[in-house]
Amino acid sequence: MDTNSIISQIGNTPLVKLKQASELTGCNIYGKAEYFNPGESVKDRAALFIVQDALNRNLISKGGTIVEGTAGNTGIGLAVVCKEYGLKLKIVIPNTQSIEKKETLKKLGAELIEVDAVPYSNPKNYIKQSKKIAEDLNKKSKNGVYWANQFDNLINAEAHIKTTAEEIWNQTAGLI
């Protein structure tokens, strides 16, 4: 196991039997303990794949910037991964998020752009603003700017097809 890199610790999380749910249903119910990932969530996998995809396609290079609109764990996962790859991270976040979440993101190196919390249908929605910010920054960046776009980025699902699904298959010896 490679222990020289925090991102090498993403994935291979335990599969644990959920005792009460199993007893109540009469079935064996399991859950992936994704809180064992460095960013403590399932979003670390997606963040890793999204960043690696952007790097592999030469959309960004070291010193480049990832931009994402997130109110949740994707931002923390991206912060962990971006730090490892020497990338900047700008998070567009609703100003209604907890101080603790915002402080965590800042301590992990993310620059926060706080915006009003408005419905997705509003052009000022944090996700739509993140796309616009990425487009504007990319016009003047020499190392590239990439909009992570977690909700529509197919790499997000690919992360789970290639890692989570395979882990579950192996951890259950194919008996699922």
Language-model features: locations:
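PLP-dependent amino-acid enzyme catalytic core
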Residues: 1-176
